[in-house]
Regions:
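Metalloprotease/metallohydrolase-associated module, dominated by Zn2+-dependent proteases
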Residues: 175-221, 237-286
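Active-site-proximal segments of metallohydrolase catalytic domains
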Residues: 114-190
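Extracellular/periplasmic catalytic domains that process cell-envelope and extracellular macromolecules
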Residues: 47, 59-64, 145-153, 166-167, ...
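Structural recognition of the beta-strand scaffold that forms the well-ordered cores
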Residues: 65-70, 103-107, 154-160, 200-205, ...
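N-terminal carbohydrate-binding/catalytic regions of secreted carbohydrate-active enzymes
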Residues: 21-140
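Sec/Tat signal peptide C-region and signal peptidase I cleavage site
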Residues: 15-19
Length: 286
């Protein structure tokens, strides 16, 4: 049985909508990042709707790592190497954990600046057109079964090519028949040689539609923006029982799409982040 917080269906009656929060009885937690026409946009520090996050007792990832999984032959630049978009994403991850854009979350439960890396795995087999959540989990497990490192402090980010879309239940990303979200993060249990691990992962489908693109952003910038959002949320609320507000919104949900995504440290794409310290959205830590 799933407990689902869904306000997306009531867009004609409400001035804004929220992230779709899905908590299952097996401990799996999923948070869908809405398209830009479905986001709340709290904006100004101390402004209307400035409702701080509360801590609900669950774990955070105090010293996180990032790992990119590029799924499909489309990530080939034609010479057998990763293309420019994938290469830029690795550059983004290699510096993200030390930026002010990341350090803003250190106010939550002792989270530290992260040693995010540019480690990756490239699976050149092509994914199906519709990549369900179970298929995405199977792809992460495929990496593990091929000798990949199993680590419960790593966020495994799976990048999909433009020939595929992501689906979770009846909701889809760009390219699917029921467009609702641009990306999401979740978790699952994996039995490794060193015991059961709580694996954190994110689905990063290709931002091929207007609802998941920001004016002036390149495709890589849009990916970076979503990776920023999903990585920080997977760190501050990995299992759905740590940091979120009374409506179920996690830190990045409260600043999704408004204020406007921006080009920040290193020229990469970022999202504003909720700060309890100022009761509003900020670009970086002070």
């Amino acid at each position: 049985m799933k407990r689902i917080l869904v306000v997306l269906a009531f867009l004609s009656f409400a001035p804004f909508a929220f992230a779709q929060r899905i908590d299952e009885t097996n401990g799996k937690h999923t948070q869908l990042y809405p398209t830009k026409d479905k986001a709340p946009g709290w904006a100004k520090p101390g402004g209307a709707g400035a409702q701080n996050l509360s801590y609900h007792g669950g774990p955070v990832i105090t010293q996180a790592k990032a790992f990119a999984i590029f799924w499909g032959s489309q990530w080939n630049d034609g010479t057998g190497h990763l293309n420019a978009i994938a290469s830029e994403m690795l550059g983004f991850f290699s510096q993200f954990g030390g930026t002010g854009e990341y350090k803003v979350i250190t106010q939550y439960s002792g989270i530290q600046p992260a040693s995010l890396t540019n480690a990756f795995w490239w699976d050149q087999s092509d994914p199906p057109a519709n990549v369900t959540d179970s298929a995405l989990v199977a792809e992460v497990v495929k990496y593990f079964n091929q000798g990949g490192v199993v680590d419960d402090t790593t966020v495994y980010s799976v990048f999909l090519p433009s020939t595929s879309y992501s689906s979770f239940g009846t909701s889809d990303s760009c390219g699917g028949p029921h467009l609702v979200y641009c990306a999401y993060h979740s978790n699952f249990s994996f039995n490794s040689s060193s015991g059961t691990k709580d694996i954190k992962y994110s689905s990063l489908p290709y931002p091929s539609c207007g609802g998941c693109q920001w004016p002036g952003f390149s495709t890589a910038n849009n990916f970076e923006h979503f990776a920023c959002h999903e990585t920080r949320e997977a760190v501050t609320d990995p299992d759905g029982n740590a940091w979120f507000d009374r409506r179920g919104n996690e830190a990045d949900d409260k600043c999704a799409w408004s204020p406007a995504p921006f080009l920040g440290t290193g020229g990469y794409g970022y999202q504003w982040e909720w700060s309890n310290a100022v009761s509003g959205c900020v670009q970086t830590a002070p």
